[in-house]
UniProtKB/Swiss-Prot annotation:
UniProt-recorded name of the protein: E3 ubiquitin-protein ligase CBL-B
PANTHER family: CBL, E3 UBIQUITIN-PROTEIN LIGASE CBL-B
Region ranges (Linker): 344-372
Region SH2-like, annotated ranges: 241-343
Gene: Cblb
Extent of Pro residues compositional bias: 544-566, 819-828
UBA domain sequence ranges: 931-970
Catalysed reaction equations from the record: S-ubiquitinyl-[E2 ubiquitin-conjugating enzyme]-L-cysteine + [acceptor protein]-L-lysine = [E2 ubiquitin-conjugating enzyme]-L-cysteine + N(6)-ubiquitinyl-[acceptor protein]-L-lysine
Post-translational modification: Phosphorylated on tyrosine and serine residues upon TCR or BCR activation. Phosphorylated on Tyr-664 and Tyr-708 in adipocytes following insulin stimulation. Auto-ubiquitinated upon EGF-mediated cell activation or upon T-cell costimulation by CD28; which promotes proteasomal degradation.
GO cellular component: cytosol; glutamatergic synapse; nucleoplasm; postsynapse
Summary of the function given for this chain in its UniProt record: E3 ubiquitin-protein ligase which accepts ubiquitin from specific E2 ubiquitin-conjugating enzymes, and transfers it to substrates, generally promoting their degradation by the proteasome. Negatively regulates TCR (T-cell receptor), BCR (B-cell receptor) and FCER1 (high affinity immunoglobulin epsilon receptor) signal transduction pathways. In naive T-cells, inhibits VAV1 activation upon TCR engagement and imposes a requirement for CD28 costimulation for proliferation and IL-2 production.
Amino-acid positions noted as binding 4-O-phospho-L-tyrosine in the UniProt annotation, renumbered to this chain: 286
EC numbers on record: 2.3.2.27
């Protein structure tokens, strides 16, 4: 065996037999007694090592060497090692931490080994002299081998000290069986002497002789320091998997196989195969020096070319068997005898994944199954990525890797190995069946629950999705979230706002996660239409049961442009989509709620939208559950997307109601929706409409349909994406108008409150068609600073206020406005203005953000100063109302921009004019403006606040008497107002 290995290893000690015998004796002694104790690796020792490394670099820079810039390139490796050591020292800069580092067992051994290897390289130059410049000399080969060792040491220090912080005790071994062995014998140790390791390994896998032990050490000890680190052990177990037959595999592949080359580089493999260029099928294999833990196989093609490849997702013996069958790997190292490796292919038991009842219920709610691959939604999961543990189907993994995808498609972790798995389906019980029947099957499919990492990776699936089926996006009712499957397993920190709703859904924690997954799903840029979002493609490949009509296709210009239809996932109403005109059908939540644009509030908005999505067939209970779960998830999403609060200006609402921007991912409710009880009571107070709305809250779907049935509100509700209740719908409509879909989106409190009256009116009038990007926030009645601090509370207030205001408004509006008069496309100026608005205005900032208010502030400050609104109400609602009112008008055009034919009430222009006058440059005739101003002044003279007067006039279409009756009923804070402060 030793002879065969020497023959295949040009770096063997055959050049100097006497020296080789001496070194062999030294190795035997060290193997028997173990390595000496290491001195502390203090700063002085590290700096001394740096000097030695620098000397090696200078020697290697001699032009006579003519080193090739190919791996392993020592002139890159040593400087990188130096930089990483500097990073480590910077993390342990103070005296106490530095003392801990200098006493770290692994670090001491590493520095000592690095110093010895550097001295050895220097000595090599001194002894080799001119022979070092001969490319085929043994001394030059020894330098190449040292380069490989330095390369292994660099990879090891980066793995044990990622980002300069010691993580050796937390290092994750890829193979579960191997990890169990290490934990059992060595606990959390990072490195152990070879002698100790050999004894422990012998207890599990018998080592037949001392000669075999020496050969095994030369294979495992990649850094040649007489120690085995957890990193080296992980590499070895990945190379010669599976663990159950690891020594047998090693004997077949490394000891006796003529194709195995130890410590060879890419260039050396190419040079070695050059002599077999006339013998196609000749091959050799080596450890990849750039991807430790994987094999590199070099072979001669039929036309005499030499190629090298790294097999993925299969053991080496399987790759060699497959290549032999295909005619690629026939002659190992040019020899006619090709070992038969089929004996290593003993069927290994698949890892069985048991589906828990909780997972079963969760996936029932989504209308999917745990077994289904969440990337393609076509095949069952049959492979597990190691070490992260994500599950998917083999075809998706292969497509991802062939598209040059780096790391796990879910979490971006390095793929160190894969394991075949079988998912054992859960045997449905009565509870599970009941859960499935309650939840709409069109709920968003969630990510696998098998992932621990909650990473943004928000880009992770875009590439794979595009590789898979980009064209199916529009047709598929469902989109897979971008978050990692395992991430779903981890329950998010409960948001205080979510807490009231957690008990409603059948599986509250999971529903929250669903929302979370939705928001996280990678979507097109804010300016891109939801349809074009690659993330949408992934799950749409395979629609969930009874897929609704394509939600993403923009419907023909609706009578009222759908503001932001509820997400396919969240809205259970999509089922009803069949009964609703295509334009009315809500868009998928992804399209509706741009997580980035809306931020936290958007998430809430998304919940609302989803809840509001029309679905007549859904029971009240299901709608309530969906609503609350969505609300909870929105909060989760809000947390995650606060950084995205501002949607880009480009965000536009399409005729189908989709936001062109990321906003489409998370529609309207910015603020955590007030408890359902608060929303419903407010609705009930408003009257029959409110009652219907409260019922709708229970049946988001049913309620939405009902509202749609109401003529004036019909276009509005459709556009606005049915929300949990009227309150919700109104907020949604606001988003349509250009408010972040929901009143809550902008300063949910203020907006929602104001939007309660104007929004309803707007929706009745068709204003709901405004796009989120177009929103022109009206100046907050109160100074923006007040609104911004109260965003969170205002959001809560907004829903209740909106509900209270909406019912009466809804009644009036419904009576006054024709249900389906589609106004002509909004003037170009509106769309332009809305588009020109700052991104903040276009995407209403979440309840916690002032971005949306900022644009309105400049216009509204004077106004707000003139008429202070009641503190309880205005704090949250005034700015929102003003913004919303103006945005409703302005955004109607913007939504029309997206669709070019937003449905509007018969008199949209006057409403726009009023808001525009205050919020933007007046676009309407001066006479009309003066007329509106006179009416506003008249009503303000009666003691009403400016914003309320403005909203009332907008709803009443500038009819003073109707506006006065509205103000009498809604001018003062409704009985629910205390809830706004919650």
């Amino acid at each position: 065996m030793a002879n065969s290995m020497n023959g295949r290893n040009p770096g063997g000690r055959g050049g100097n037999p006497r020296k080789g015998r001496i070194l062999g004796i030294i190795d035997a002694i060290q193997d028997a007694v173990g390595p000496p104790k290491q001195a502390a690796a203090d700063r002085r020792t590290v700096e001394k090592t740096w000097k030695l490394m620098d000397k090696v670099v200078r020697l290697c820079q001699n032009p006579k060497l003519q080193l090739k810039n190919s791996p392993p390139y020592i002139l890159d490796i040593l400087p990188d090692t130096y930089q990483h050591l500097r990073l480590i020292l910077s993390k342990y800069d103070d005296n106490q931490k530095l003392a801990q580092l200098s006493e770290n067992e692994y670090f001491k051994i590493y520095i000592d080994s690095l110093m010895k290897k550097s001295k050895r390289a220097i000595r090599l130059f001194k002894e080799g002299k001119e022979r070092m410049y001969e490319e085929q000399s043994q001394d030059r080969r020894n330098l190449t081998k040292l380069s490989l060792i330095f390369s292994h040491m660099l990879a090891e220090i980066k793995a044990i000290f990622p980002n300069g912080q010691f993580q050796g005790d937390n290092f994750r071994i890829t193979k579960a069986d191997a990890a169990e062995f290490w934990r059992k014998f060595f606990g959390d140790k990072t490195i152990v002497p070879w002698k100790v390791f050999r004894q422990c390994l012998h207890e599990v896998h018998q080592i037949s002789s001392g000669l075999e032990a020496m050969a095994l050490k030369s294979t495992i000890d990649l850094t040649c320091n007489d120690y085995i680190s957890v990193f080296e052990f992980d590499i070895f177990t990945r190379l010669f998997q599976p663990w159950g037959s690891i020594l047998r595999n090693w004997n077949f592949l490394a000891v006796t196989h003529p194709g195995y080359m130890a410590f060879l580089t890419y260039d050396e493999v190419k040079a070695r195969l050059q002599k077999y260029s006339t013998k196609p099928g000749s091959y050799i294999f080596r450890l990849s020096c750039t991807r430790l833990g994987q094999w590199a196989i070099g072979y001669v093609t039929g036309d005499g070319n030499i190629l090298q490849t790294i097999p993925h997702n299969k053991p080496l013996f399987q790759a060699l068997i497959d290549g032999s069958r295909e005619g690629f790997y026939l002659y190992p190292d040019g020899r006619s005898y090709n070992p038969d490796l089929t004996g290593l292919c003993e069927p290994t038991p698949h890892d069985h994944i048991k589906v828990t009842q909780e997972q079963y219920e969760l996936y029932c709610e989504m209308g999917s199954t745990f077994q289904l691959c969440k990337i393609c939604a076509e095949n069952d999961k049959d492979v597990k990525i190691e070490p992260c543990g994500h599950l998917m189907c083999t075809s998706c993994l292969t497509a991802w890797q062939e598209s040059d995808g780096q790391g796990c498609p879910f979490c971006r972790c390095e793929i160190k190995g894969t394991e075949p798995i079988i998912v054992d389906p859960f045997d449905p019980r009565d509870e599970g069946s009941r859960c499935c029947s309650i939840i709409d099957p069109f709920s968003i499919p969630m990510l696998d629950l098998d992932d621990d990492d909650d990473r943004e990776e928000s880009l992770m699936m875009n590439r794979l999705a595009s590789v898979r089926k980009c064209t199916d996006r529009q047709n598929s009712p469902v989109t897979s979230p971008g978050s990692s499957p395992l991430a779903q397993r981890r329950k998010p920190q409960p948001d205080p706002l979510q807490i009231p709703h957690l008990s409603l859904p059948p599986v509250p924690p999971r529903l929250d996660l669903i929302q979370k997954g939705i928001v996280r799903s990678p979507c097109g840029s804010p300016t891109g239409s939801p349809k074009s979002s690659p993330c949408m493609v992934r799950k749409q490949d395979k629609p969930l049961p009874a897929p609704p009509p394509p939600l993403r296709d923009p419907p023909p210009p609706p009578e009222r442009p759908p503001p932001i239809p509820p997400d396919n996932r969240l809205s259970r109403h999509f089922h009803h989509g069949e009964s609703v005109p295509s334009r009315d059908q809500p868009m998928p939540l992804e399209a509706w709620c741009p997580r980035d644009a809306f931020g936290t509030n958007q998430v809430m908005g998304c919940r609302i939208l989803g809840d509001g999505s029309p679905k007549p067939g859904v029971t009240a209970n299901s709608s309530l559950n969906g609503r609350h779960s969505r609300m909870g998830s929105e909060q989760v999403l809000m947390r995650k997307h606060r950084r995205h609060d501002l949607p880009s200006e480009g965000a536009k609402v399409f005729s189908n109601g989709h936001l062109a921007t990321e906003e489409y991912d998370v529609p309207p409710r910015l603020s955590p929706p007030p408890p359902v009880t608060t929303l419903l009571p407010s609705i009930k107070c408003t009257g029959p409409l409110a009652n219907c709305l409260s019922e709708k809250t229970r049946d988001t779907v049913e309620d939405d349909d009902d509202e749609y049935k109401i003529p004036s509100s019909h276009p509005v509700s459709l556009n606005s994406q049915p929300s949990h209740c009227h309150n919700v719908k109104a907020p949604v409509r606001s988003c349509d108008n250009g408010h972040c879909i929901l009143n809550g989106t902008h300063g949910a409190p203020s907006e929602m409150k104001k939007s309660n009256i104007p929004d309803l009116g707007i929706y009745l009038k068709g204003g709901g068609s405004d796009s989120a990007s177009d929103p022109v926030p009206l100046p907050p009645a109160r100074p923006p600073p007040r609104d911004s601090p109260k965003h969170g509370s205002s959001v809560n207030r907004t829903p209740s206020d909106y509900d209270l205001l909406i019912p009466p408004l809804g009644e009036d509006a419904f009576d006054a406005l024709p249900p389906s008069l589609p106004p002509p496309p909004p003037p170009a100026r509106h769309s332009l203005i809305e588009h020109s608005k700052p991104p903040g205005s276009s995407s209403r900032p979440s309840s916690g953000q002032d971005l949306f208010l900022l644009p309105s502030d400049p216009f509204f400050d004077p106004t707000s100063g003139q008429v202070p609104l009641p503190p309880a109400r205005r704090a949250a609602g005034d700015s929102g109302k003003a913004n919303r009112a103006s945005q409703d008008y302005d955004q109607l055009p913007s939504s029309s921009d997206g669709s070019q034919a937003p449905a509007r009430p018969p008199k949209p222009r006057p409403r726009r004019t009023a808001p525009e006058i205050h919020h933007r440059k007046p676009h309407g005739p001066e006479a009309a403006l003066e007329n509106v101003d006179a009416k506003i002044a008249k009503l303000m003279g009666e003691g009403y606040a400016f914003e309320e007067v403005k909203r009332a006039l907008e709803i009443a279409q500038n009819n003073v008497e109707v506006a006065r009756s509205i103000l009498r009923e809604f001018a003062f804070p409704p009985p629910v107002s205390p809830r706004l402060n919650l």
